[in-house]
Amino acid sequence: MKNWPRLAFIAWVLLRQGMDQLVLSHMPHASLRLLARLMSIGRTHHEPRGVRLRMALERLGPIFVKFGQVLSTRRDLIPHDIANELAKLQDRVPPFPSDVSRAAVVQSLGRPIEEVFASFDADPVASASIAQVHFGVLHDGREVAVKVLRPNVLNIIEADLALLRVAAAWLERLSPDGRRLRPREVVAEFDNYLHDELDLGREAANAAQLRRNMGGLDLIMLPEMIWDLSSAEVLVMERMHGVPISQIETLRAAGIDIPKLARDGVTIFFTQVFRDGFFHADMHPGNIMVSTAPATFGRYIALDFGIVGTLDSRDKEYLAQNFLAFFRRDYRRVAELHIESGWVPASTRVDELEGAVRAVCEPHFDRPLKDISLGQVLLRLFQTSRRFNVEIQPQLVLLQKTLLNVEGLGRQLDPELDLWQTAKPFLERWMNEQVGWRALLGSIKDEAPRYAKLLPELPRLLHDALQAHARPQRPSDELLLALLHEQRRTNRLLLTVFYLIGGFVAGGLFAHWILPGLLHLL
């Protein structure tokens, strides 16, 4: 295997940071636990485990940094100290040369850069592991931002993914938990996730959808995508001018109403969630500016659309009813909602789940309503749900992470922000739209054309259903099992992170101590 040097380096980094002790000590094999104790002799680590894991991931490069960033959002799965530390991971790397950027743009455009751009800044304004951004001006005078994929990034990622596959294979051999979690399938899913990020055309489509959705809301601005100049490798968009939202004193000096700005951010988020079911899922301060231009004074400016979340009506109903039941302290209804969702095993007792929900939610009411964190409420519900083998939906985990970001930013702008008072009208409006005669008539109107087409086929469909019921097999059960299997796949991705580290350690030890002897015998 040509990647043995890289595998050995990964194992060395993990060993140096004491990750072997963290993983091997939890392995079921006594020999591996003994190995962990022997390898810890003579080594002292003064930093906490979360710090050591973060430092190891930073040393190992972009794919591991991204894995850590994703893992940091799963506070329902990992200890808080590790999640807090991984949240500090920054995807920043030195820029690549401007002539390489220009060459990539020329290749994407299929013509000299001078034919399209009146000017193209040599120095990038931002640089990350996947891409970097340059400013430029088109010949028609439009100012643009040009996002260019890092050269050879695909090969770099493929090399590390190959090693992840090796680690996953070792994991399946070493650990019963590893076999249960199907790490090779998990690595394949992470592969898909990374390749989605490498497609700038997908990011452009996300931006266009958000811009269209937000068109009637005068609280936010999003850049226009310039489709005829963009591709999967190069994204050209309107350049946006504003003040970074983290520069609060600068915004205050410019005359921005800071408390209103905080409320507007919450309004934007809940509009995206409950009206559109499509939300920007990377709303940290680095991706937000505020306009100070007279015509758009005080509006949010959103950037970077690589991560978005999608919610269907079932997700929105789950959220709205859970929040409303929580603030009414109706914990039985919260428990019933979890069971009605179908994500809880059918054998779960409502009263047991109700008691667990009460235990984690009631302490929140020791403080004023304005100080209650909706993101923390969701997090505690997810943590409680895990004890009852609830399959936490990935889109809801993404929303919970984004909600924490929005809350954090809002309270950074205005410590007195009452998130509940801002969110409550959205929840109540959505619930009112889903019940009553108006909602029923709207549903009938929307579904009437489809049902009209089905009416002539009704006898055949009824006959097929009766025939299927008479068969010994249960296709509906098989379909249900397949759907449940799909829901579990994303959670397995992050449940295996520490076991993958164990696979790397074992692979590195094999490469360093065992493989040379085998080669010598051959």
UniProtKB/Swiss-Prot annotation:
Taxonomic placement: Bacteria, Pseudomonadati, Pseudomonadota, Betaproteobacteria, Burkholderiales
Function comment: Is probably a protein kinase regulator of UbiI activity which is involved in aerobic coenzyme Q (ubiquinone) biosynthesis.
Family per similarity comment: Belongs to the ABC1 family. UbiB subfamily.
Membrane topology annotation: Single-pass membrane protein
Pfam families linked to this entry: ABC1
Species in which this protein is naturally found: Leptothrix cholodnii (strain ATCC 51168 / LMG 8142 / SP-6)
Gene Ontology CC annotations of this record: plasma membrane
One MF term in the entry's GO annotations: ATP binding
Gene Ontology annotations of biological process type: regulation of ubiquinone biosynthetic process; ubiquinone biosynthetic process
Protein name, entry field: Probable protein kinase UbiB
